Amino acid sequence: MVRFSEIARTEILKTLNSPQIPVGYALRIGLKGGACSASYLLGLDKATENDELYEVEGVKVLIDKRHLMYLIGVAIDYAETESGMGFTITKT
């Protein structure tokens, strides 16, 4: 389903366990837009009735049921460079 690099997993868990994040939140992976112009989204959120909740490598992951088939096989990484830091999502 979804794969995390070790550094991405570490950064996500560090964020989710931060005291500023409300209890019960999970990593939301989703899509914005459609067809050829869709882009991936990452965020922290509570589950809704439209979500599936998974635990992947110790990370609680929320995915809207409508997005499931499009997110199979995505890989999430994290990088720090001179120009900034952040997550990348690629489809493998």
Predicted features along the sequence, with ranges:
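Short, low-complexity, intrinsically disordered N-terminal segments
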Residues: 14-27, 57
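C-terminal structural segments of small proteins and small subunits
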Residues: 63-92
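Residue-level signature of catalytic and energy-coupling elements of molecular machines
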Residues: 12, 58, 76
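Short acidic-hydrophobic surface loop/beta-edge motif
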Residues: 52-56
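Phosphate-interacting basic helix/loop segments used at nucleotide- and nucleic-acid interfaces
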Residues: 7-15
